């Protein structure tokens, strides 16, 4: 079953968990790594078992916890090319985890099919994601 749980939402930080079976994907990491790991654990998800992190854009309220989080866990981080370029300089312990994906270029993450799509925003390379799994589909941005 495909599930979505908000860990935080708003101008002070954004992070959410999307799960399908044993696949767990973090959407944005705009809160502290401690809040992310505490939130995941409260949902019964070991942070080390995250399948991937999907980043919508490089603004602080979407990535502020990413640098510390990637010191502790090592999931692949997917983002649009422009966002990957911005994040590479901010992730001294995680730049090698970045995987660039163009809007419209779908890819698999465990039991999920992920398709990025362009979104209008003042951040270069801003994307949302359509996630499909377990017979369900959701769009997030």
Please give the residue ranges for each predicted region.
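Active-site metal-binding motif and surrounding structural segment of the metallo-beta-lactamase
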Residues: 33-79
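Short glycine-enriched loop/turn motifs at secondary-structure junctions
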Residues: 21, 70-71, 92
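Conserved beta-strand hairpin/beta-sheet module of binuclear metal-dependent hydrolase folds
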Residues: 1-43, 127-141
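A generic structural signal for short beta-strands and their flanking turns/coil linkers
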Residues: 14, 23, 49-51, 73, ...
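Structured catalytic core of nucleotide-sugar glycosyltransferases
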Residues: 5-16, 52-66, 71, 84-88, ...
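Metallo-beta-lactamase
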Residues: 81-135
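Structured loop/turn residues at beta-strand edges in well-structured enzyme cores
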Residues: 2, 45-48, 93, 112
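Active-site metal-binding loops of divalent metal-dependent hydrolases
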Residues: 8, 29-31, 58, 82, ...
């Amino acid at each position: 079953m495909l599930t979505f749980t908000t860990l935080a939402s708003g101008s002070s930080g954004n992070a959410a968990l999307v799960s399908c079976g044993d696949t767990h994907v973090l959407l944005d990491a705009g809160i502290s790594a401690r809040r992310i790991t505490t939130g995941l654990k409260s949902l019964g998800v070991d942070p080390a078992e995250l399948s991937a992190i999907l980043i919508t854009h490089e603004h602080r309220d979407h990535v502020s916890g990413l640098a510390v989080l990637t010191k502790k866990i090592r999931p692949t981080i997917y983002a649009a090319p422009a966002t990957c370029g911005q994040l590479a300089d901010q992730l001294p312990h995680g730049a090698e985890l970045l995987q660039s994906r163009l809007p419209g270029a779908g890819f698999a993450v465990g039991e999920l099919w992920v398709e990025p799509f362009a979104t209008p925003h003042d951040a270069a390379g801003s994307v949302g994601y359509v996630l499909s799994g377990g017979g369900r589909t959701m769009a997030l941005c």
